[in-house]
Amino acid sequence: MSSEFVISMAEKAVYVTLMISGPLLAIALLVGLIVSIFQATTQIQEQTLAFIPKIVAVLLALIFFGPWMLSTILSFTTELFSNLNRFAG
């Protein structure tokens, strides 16, 4: 197992992690920004107003993006396990 192979697998793992977490983080960021703008314009300083819409939006995004996320992680895991003999040898 060469160092290039290890770096390649680590690079793929980081890429898959970013691809899976990216949509949920982007939606949470967007909803948080919208709620913050709403709070600033209406001068409402309720703490729960910031968290509940983000939780609901991320939950809905998880339902929407869940199958794609699962297929992405399964294909990476399948590739990882199919090349297991290259790791040990």
Curated annotation (Swiss-Prot):
Predominant place of localization: membrane
Which spans are transmembrane here?
Answer: 18-38, 55-75
Recorded hits in InterPro entries, A to Z, give: Bac_export_3, FliQ
- Cite a single GO BP annotation: bacterial-type flagellum-dependent swarming motility
Topology with respect to the bilayer: Multi-pass membrane protein
Q: Which Pfam families match?
A: Bac_export_3
| UniProt-annotated location(s) | Cell membrane; Bacterial flagellum basal body
Q: Name one GO cellular component term.
A: bacterial-type flagellum basal body
Taxonomy, superkingdom: Bacteria
Q: Which UniProt keywords apply?
A: Bacterial flagellum, Cell membrane, Membrane, Transmembrane, Transmembrane helix
According to its UniProt entry, the function of this protein is described as:
Role in flagellar biosynthesis.
- Which NCBIfam families does this chain map to? fliQ (TIGR01402)
Family in the record: Belongs to the FliQ/MopD/SpaQ family.
Name this protein carries in UniProt? Flagellar biosynthetic protein FliQ
Its organism's taxonomic lineage begins at:
Bacteria, Bacillati, Bacillota, Bacilli, Bacillales
